[in-house]
Amino acid sequence: MSHRHHAALVASASGRSPSWGSAISQSFRQVEAEDPFRRAQSMRGHDEEEEDLRWAALEKLPTYDRMRRGVVRSALLRDGDDDHKDDDDAGTGKAVELVDIGRLATGDAARALVERLLQDDSERFLRRLRDRIDMVGIELPKIEIRYEELSVQADAFVASRALPTLSNSAINFLQGLIGQFGSSNKKTINILKQVNGILKSSRMTLLLGPPSSGKSTLMRALTGKLDKNLKVFGNITYCGHKFSEFYPERTSAYVSQYDLHNAEMTVRETLDFSRWCLGIGSRYDMLTEISRRERNAGIKPDPEIDAFMKATAMQGQETNIITDLILKVLGLDICADTIVGDEMIRGISGGQMKRVTTGEMLTGPARALLMDEISTGLDSSSTFHIVKFIRHLVHIMNETVMISLLQPPPETYNLFDDIVLLSEGYIVYHGPRENILEFFEASGFRCPQRKAVADFLQEVTSKKDQQQYWFLDKEPYCYVSVPEFAERFKSFYIGQQMMKEQHIPFEKSKIHPAALTTMKNALSNWESLKAVLCREKLLMKRNSFLYIFKVTQLIILAFLSMTVFLRTKMPHGQFSDGTKFLGALTFNLITVMFNGLSELNLTVKKLPVFYKHRDFLFFPPWTFGVANILIKVPVSLVEATVWVVITYYVMGFAPAAGRFFRQFLAFFVTHLMAMALFRFLGAILQTMVIAISFGMLVLLIVFVFGGFVIRKNDIRPWWIWCYWASPMMYSQNAISINEFLASRWAIPNNDTTIDAKTVGEAILKSKGLFTGEWGFWLSIGALVGFIILFNTLYILALTYLSPIRSANALVIDEHNETELYTETRNEEHRSRTSTTTSSIPTSANGEGNRPTQSQFVLPFQPLSLCFNHLNYYVDMPSEMKQQGLMESRLQLLSDISGAFRPGLLTALVGVSGAGKTTLMDVLAGRKTSGTIEGSITLSGYSKKQETFARISGYCEQADIHSPNVTVYESILYSAWLRLPSDVDSNTRKMFVEEVMALVELDVLCNAMVGLPGVSGLSTEQRKRLTIAVELVANPSIIFMDEPTSGLDARAAAIVMRTVRNTVNTGRTVVCTIHQPSIDIFESFDELLLLKRGGRVIYAGELGDHSHKLVEYFETILGVPSITEGYNPATWMLEVSSTLEEARMNVDFAEIYANSLLYRKNQELIEELSIPPPGYRDLLFATKYSQSFYIQCVANLWKQYKSYWKNPSYNSLRYLTTFLYGLFFGTVFWQKGTKLDSQQDLYNLLGATYAAIFFIGATNCMSVQPVVSIERAVYYRESAAGMYSPLSYAFAQASVEFIYNIIQGILYTVIIYAMIGYDWKASKFFYFLFFIVSSFNYFTFFGMMLVACTPSALLANILITFALPLWNLFAGFLIFRKAIPIWWRWYYWANPVSWTIYGVIASQFGGNGGSISVPGGSHVAMSQILEDNVGVRHDFLGYVILAHFGFMAAFVLIFGYSIKFLNFQKR
């Protein structure tokens, strides 16, 4: 309606006399009343005319411009609000515009278009796309993947040699070197065994198989992403072409089961970057051809589809509408602008991160998708909708897809066309889904009615599970092995048909030109560099705190150094003044260099994501290297500027402006060189422990030969090449020449022993430095050369080096027929055991031969847990306050009541965000923040957390365990500290063995635990270990958080059978569960169902076949009845969803609160809140089960076991110690036997300083990752009340002390003999004591920083602040007596200064000889040490006491920090 007509109507309605216009309006309204559709039809006609005009204008444009213009509704260019209106409204009165597609590709317009395209469903949208393509006769590319006789093998150590002990690691290393020239002792493991198959286009294949069957290996092999250390046999072809003829990495997309992303990027930014790098494929060419044919045929396409296709065909955009489409389809639009996060940065949930991993590959143009375990952490509804979209993509767009799923529910399973069943490396079945049950029935096995087919398929090949599915009553059951199944499939008609198809070669003439990708990267080199540079800028912005912290740290150090080397205390002009100026220059140089040390950490941190992107051909590796180099140039500029501007004039350096800018130039190129060096070291060393150990060794070499510690003339001939190869030497020359060739040092030289005209030249010559101005520019040129060299080597390392992978290991137990195979994080974890799973008893009574309480060695007291009107609040998050929420608190649990009883297994279920884990944490007392309201009682008495921790167990979802111990050692350790002190050792071990048998870990008792996803146990085995560790405490109540999350159906069955066995012993067990299968769900006795917001909507028994739950919901008006055979858990969550509540206009929480069931539950709570007759409240005489002494012994036992099996830390410790010792011994070879001059003494002083400081700093930094991993374990064990924090600190310090003693002896023997110190027993043992003590306090200091900070990264940054201060006040760069009086206290507070004092005093303080000094005279050595260095021999007793004091102080701070500082926020 026009504005005039509308105004007339308003005027009429307001009572004014009707005008001529209002009369016409009234007449028009009467006509409308007679024909209500006329107006809408008229307006639609107007829109169509306008659209035709716009389209005609578009058709007149050149092809290039036409591909970048589209006809769209104006509303889409505003805010998209109208998309939420009815279709009739959306189609009337809306103008259309001819717009630049670039406006439509991003922002609200893109989201509005995606909303409109997907308003019905994804299938309709894809069909609209396909209809346009078919209308002009365009054929879509198709890909067929064939694999014939495919075998994959790996080499691994076997038996006891597979355990990573220090002795084994040394033997394996030596034999590995020998094996390069001879035979290897590794055993060949067959991962895939001559498998055959065809993946066809327009068919979606489900890959099923138990853990270690080879699923990931098969997918990686088919996509060309197998580790190069694996041996591959057989043929893999795409449309008849071998891998050498195209790039499989880009033709197909592999979605890994591991989630590797930049934690600081948002979900949208992550997908945008992958889409940008993966490119558009053939979309632009196809769209151009479609547009040409439409134009020739006079066809006008659907404007919205045309606009969408043009937007997706735009190459090189930073963001694109494809990202919005994938976000919407995967349900990530609600968290699109949330950072991904990691274990230290709070971000999206695990399920959302899994979808990000999937979406990352879906944004690309690949037409073959192989997706590995994409459902981990997702509920069945999300999995179903994602797989359904992929099914539409396959069937409508002719894509080729294989998906591996864990526990696929029946509705998801039925979406697939084909099934591949893989077991023990054999293909048991590969063919249509409809025929797989027929194949197994032909072999005598039938799937029960209420059994999910996918669960049946994963259990029927298991020796332990197979018999229950045998249905031929007239024939005796006989185990059918996996190889037998594989042979039977070959003779089955489906297998015969597939073999025939494989024998017919693929007709290469039929292949679509765009099917296979022959270009290595989607983008040009410039576009790739631009994309990576934009991402690195973004990451740098997100890490701005780190760079601000570094600059702040530099400013603080600058002010500290200014006050030490204050110009008023820095006289110049005399030869003796040069030492202090050289010390100041050297400290400045070290600070600027070491401030770039964080680049090592940042480089190592980026590598996992880089390797993924490199291997997936996102970009050429050199672009990543160049981007990181360029982005850090401003950092070097800022840090060099800050340091020089603050320090130069205050320290009293040469005042000329030219000298100022030359020093700035020297520090700037030095910082660039240091950053390049650290980047290069990070790229080749790859892990933090190795990077720190060998990186510090490289820095030591660079520093020692830097021109200050030892003069060039005093360097041994075999090391002189290192002097010329040390970048720091050129930096030292540049800054020294710049200072000492200034006019104020041009005073005539009076020292006849040095051939130099001026004092400045004499100082330079005395240190072996260049003496001409040419030396400055030569040094700058050399540093630029090093910058180019290190950056080039960095790029080459990125391009050609593969990630460091953990050693392959295989443990074989001939008696138990168990194999455990561990490989790398990027390669599939494989572990095979002949005793796997059996079905969970569906009876709530748990029929079968289960252990009962009477069968256990140790009795326990059954307890019930009641909670009434429970509420939980947290402070309102700042993000939510910014969105306008004014409340101060956010309620996560709302009026929850319930009871958990002995012998009953209770399921705690709800959608994501319902508060399942929150409720469990509140009940278990694990919350560290928030406010709890309501009552919690334990068998009638109020719950006290101190005693409750002793009688309860909590199985966390994360499965946190010490990685370097065996399964048996983990469980025994838990039993040792958690069982009562009156339980003797033999009884304790018997109980441990009973528990291991209960959870079916007895066959894995000697297996290493390892790190999740990296080494050791599989996910399912770790779950059982978590249960065993808690069960061995003999608890009455056990909480389990998501015990089946991330497991396949068979592994979940093992875990749930373990849980069921635990309940049958009479314990109270509560599990949170995430979308369980029918088998798992009906193994529970009771259910507590929560809705979003932490409100109860059902609490009560499940009943046989869940009939009580079903009856309750079916009595609610509007709830649809459950379909026969449908999973009650899935049905329950579907009918109680928020959408269903809105549809029925009900609140299920209110319905429950007003129900008879609620009143019965309240009566039960009241009944259980009264203590039973004769029952007393729990009371323990001591806080912990064991005495402090036993706690220390047990903790030390575990740490000893852990350290012995941690060669990556301890073997590396001793190897680097040997190399450090060898280096110092050869550099300062027999220097201790020749002490004729003051310079000789100073050279030895420099050797002592460097020998102590650098290896100590290495210890300090390398211990931090180890302690950080163990701290996470400590938080779990401490929450369980296992031991005192001080006993843990004692054990951690003690085991380090032991290893440090060995390290100190090794180091002392090497350098003491090679440097040539005096072989007197007293001097040797003094030296040994100070070296061992320094190793200890450095190590304890590193441990202390970890305990005081929330992350190892922050602790590492603090080290880069502390170590320069220790270095400055160590007594070498500036002697004690030269330190200003206001800073001399820090000399005594610095442990390194005490060690250097002790070594110098013990070795040389008591010597009676004299040495020559500048000027030619001779002075007693003890006199020089006292007057110049400030060292006295008679002070040694105090020095020894100081070392004990520093060690004790750091250990105590570590212990009390562990006790009082809890950085785990729950």
Swiss-Prot record:
Similarity field: Belongs to the ABC transporter superfamily. ABCG family. PDR (TC 3.A.1.205) subfamily.
Phylogenetic classification of the source organism: Eukaryota, Viridiplantae, Streptophyta, Embryophyta, Tracheophyta
ABC transmembrane type-2 domain boundaries: 527-740, 1190-1404
Binding positions for ATP 2 per the UniProt entry: G910, V911, S912, G913, A914, G915, K916, T917
Biased composition (Basic and acidic residues): 821-831
Record's subcellular location: Membrane
PROSITE patterns: ABC_TRANSPORTER_2
CDD domains the record matches: ABCG_PDR_domain1 (cd03233), ABCG_PDR_domain2 (cd03232)
Domain ABC transporter residue range list: 176-449, 865-1117
Chief localization: membrane
Biased composition (Low complexity): 833-843
Annotated segments matching region Disordered: 1-21, 821-851
Gene3D superfamilies attached to this UniProt entry: P-loop containing nucleotide triphosphate hydrolases (3.40.50.300)
Single GO cellular component term: plasma membrane
SMART domains: AAA
Record-given protein name: ABC transporter G family member 40
Pfam family, one: ABC2_membrane_7
Membrane-protein topology: Multi-pass membrane protein
Membrane-spanning parts: 545-565, 581-601, 633-653, 664-684, 690-710, 776-796, 1209-1229, 1241-1261, 1297-1317, 1327-1347, 1355-1375, 1396-1416, 1435-1455
Binding-site list for ATP 1: G209, P210, P211, S212, S213, G214, K215, S216
GO MF term list: ABC-type transporter activity; ATP binding; ATP hydrolysis activity
Keyword Nucleotide-binding: yes
Keyword field: ATP-binding, Membrane, Nucleotide-binding, Repeat, Transmembrane, Transmembrane helix, Transport
